Design a protein with these regions (language model features):
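Long, contiguous binding/interaction regions
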Residues: 1-118
């Protein structure tokens, strides 16, 4: 199986936000008519682990990351504990509400099996 290095957002969508000092990140494969949707969902569910998230988003390294599989929705929910410090009012981050975290994750390059890209 050959892999190609592509942005995660090639076929993965995202939404993100804050809950106190934690960041919440939803990643899913849309129903776009692709014959590869089921295989893409399977790849996403098996690929997105706490370690994967810490590599994908270096600012999450050293933090507690939880990943919840949502197979019926074709995605995962990721909680990054403590990413926002004491919360939006006290955060010094450029994106204190983690609203841009989803697009940042989608822009990051990952190894994707070639057969999922056609």
């Amino acid at each position: 199986m050959t892999h190609q290095r592509r942005p995660l957002g090639t076929f993965v969508h995202a939404r993100s936000g804050d809950k106190g000092g934690d960041a919440n990140l939803g990643l899913w494969v849309a129903h776009d008519g692709s014959t590869h949707r089921d295989a893409r969902v399977e790849w996403l569910l098996s690929t997105v682990t706490p370690d994967f998230v810490k590599t994908l988003l270096p600012e999450a390294a050293g933090l507690d990351v939880e990943v919840f599989a949502l197979p019926n929705l074709g995605g995962v929910n990721v909680v990054i504990h403590g990413l926002l410090g004491a919360g939006v009012a006290a955060s010094t981050r450029f994106d204190p509400q983690a609203k841009g975290l989803g697009e940042w994750a989608r822009s990051r390059h990952v190894d994707i099996p070639g057969e999922l890209l056609s």
